[in-house]
Design a protein with these regions (language model features):
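Non-heme Fe(II)-dependent double-stranded beta-helix
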Residues: 1-25, 32-169
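Catalytic palm active-site di-aspartate
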Residues: 27-28, 233
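A structural signal for short, well-ordered beta-strand segments and their strand-loop junctions
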Residues: 30-32, 128-131, 207-208, 237-238
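Short, well-ordered beta-to-alpha junction loops that form the rim of enzyme active sites
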Residues: 34, 131-134, 195, 211, ...
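Flexible loop/turn segments at secondary-structure boundaries
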Residues: 39, 200, 216, 244-245
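Active-site rim elements
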Residues: 103-108, 179-180, 223-224, 245
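Catalytic core of non-heme Fe(II) oxygenases with the double-stranded beta-helix
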Residues: 117-118, 141-229
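Conserved metal-binding segment of the jelly-roll/cupin
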Residues: 230-244
Length: 245
């Protein structure tokens, strides 16, 4: 419902201008040939080694099971519960965290010239890296619920209105002023997804609601989404406000 009628889906492009336009209008863009064949081979090899080692050592993080809601990492007392995110608890996908500590090939991604240019164009001159993680998607995983990666950002509101305090917001509880001010929050977060394998409709690629980054709202679970697709070596950059899962 947010995508203009005459718009078309972003396609993998080597043009910085086209990627910037897609990002602004649709909420995401696809950079073609972002990774060379040698980079792809090195990244796959190192990631496979690391993922296997973490499974063998017994601390692999695995999610995507029917009772494993993304974001429910703590119990009612606020304690982490890693025992709930294991293969034994139904986890299908494997997350490999903290890639900054797990190989130079992962560090090299952080200095990719074109992607850094796109990030700077969206966020400005100064920003922080908050996560560098791999997700190995396997058959049988449950689809992630639609969410934004900027859910913690309070939206603009009216003077005198008592909204939900920022510290009480969560992925499931957020402040939506039913009387729209016409203003939306700026982007303050972005994600880059490096496709080490082809992303298709059928293999669990990220789903997005096009243009939803301009809605000024948190997700409507009934919104129509599309699968982001692209060949191996493509990089996808997403505005932190876009609805995705």
């Amino acid at each position: 419902p947010y995508l203009p009628v005459n718009s078309s889906l972003p396609q993998p492009s080597s043009s910085l201008e086209q990627c910037a336009n897609d990002l602004a209008q649709q909420g995401y863009c696809l950079l073609h040939h972002a990774l060379t064949n040698s980079q792809l081979e090195a990244l796959r090899k190192r990631l496979t080694e690391q993922a296997l080692a973490e499974k063998q050592k017994g601390f692999a993080f695995q999610d995507g099971g029917h009772s494993q809601n993304w974001g429910d990492f703590r119990d009612s007392a606020g304690e982490l519960r890693p025992q709930e995110f294991t293969e034994a608890q139904g986890g299908r996908n494997q997350r490999v965290w903290m890639l900054v500590n797990k190989g130079a090939v992962f560090l090299d991604l952080l200095s990719h010239t074109i992607m850094r240019g796109l990030v700077t164009g969206l966020l400005g001159d100064h920003y922080l890296l908050s996560s560098h993680t791999a997700n190995i998607a396997n058959p049988g995983g449950v689809a992630m619920r639609l969410h934004t990666d900027q859910w913690w950002m309070p939206p603009p509101t009216r003077i005198g209105r008592a909204g939900l305090p920022a510290g009480s917001m969560s992925r499931e509880l957020f402040d939506n002023d039913t009387e729209s001010t016409g203003a939306i929050s700026p982007p303050v977060a972005v994600n880059i997804l490096w496709m080490l394998d082809e992303f298709t409709e059928s293999n669990g690629g990220t789903r997005l609601v096009l243009g939803s980054h301009l809605s000024g709202r948190q997700p409507d679970s009934t919104a129509k989404s599309i699968a982001a697709t692209g060949p191996a070596g493509t990089a996808m950059l997403c505005d932190g406000r876009i609805w995705h899962g």
